[in-house]
């Protein structure tokens, strides 16, 4: 977003569907792998809130479990329509229909998750640029 010069128009945030890690830093492995790619991964976890529907134009989820959990919090069809899957922005031939949770895996799993997130974000950003 910043590289595209759109950080004054696009706000990006991250949160979890559950309260398991609220207030904690991200997994140390994700921080390490993210840092190797030049990302600052130093935010503290927060749980998704229905108020996020008022704050954000789009809610992007990583997998079907996230989709169901967030959809259950939508108060209107308009809110539900703004919940999108990251997999909708992945290359059709990438072989994944969601972003696998790397938490129980190893280094390769964290790299894969970041690869898929980067790929999806590139396509999502292209779409947003056409809309702005």
Question: What are the residue ranges of the model-derived segments?
Answer:
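Small/polar loops that bind or transfer phosphate-bearing groups
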Residues: 14, 61-62
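Phosphate-binding/catalytic loops
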Residues: 58, 64-132
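Conserved active-site segments centered on acidic
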Residues: 1-56, 126-132
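A short linear-motif detector with a strong N-terminal bias
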Residues: 38-40, 62-65
């Amino acid at each position: 977003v910043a590289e595209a010069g759109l950080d004054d128009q696009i706000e990006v945030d991250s949160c979890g569907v559950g309260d398991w890690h609220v207030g904690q830093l991200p997994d140390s492995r994700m921080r390490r792998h993210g840092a190797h790619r030049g990302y600052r991964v130093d935010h503290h976890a927060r749980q998704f809130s229905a108020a996020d529907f008022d704050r954000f134009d789009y809610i992007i989820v990583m997998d079907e479990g996230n989709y169901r959990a967030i959809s259950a919090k939508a108060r209107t069809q308009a809110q539900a329509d703004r919940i999108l899957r990251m997999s909708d922005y992945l290359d059709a031939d990438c072989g994944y229909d969601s972003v696998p949770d790397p938490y129980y895996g190893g280094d390769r799993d964290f790299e894969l998750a970041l690869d898929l997130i980067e790929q999806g974000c590139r396509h999502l950003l292209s779409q947003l640029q056409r809309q702005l």
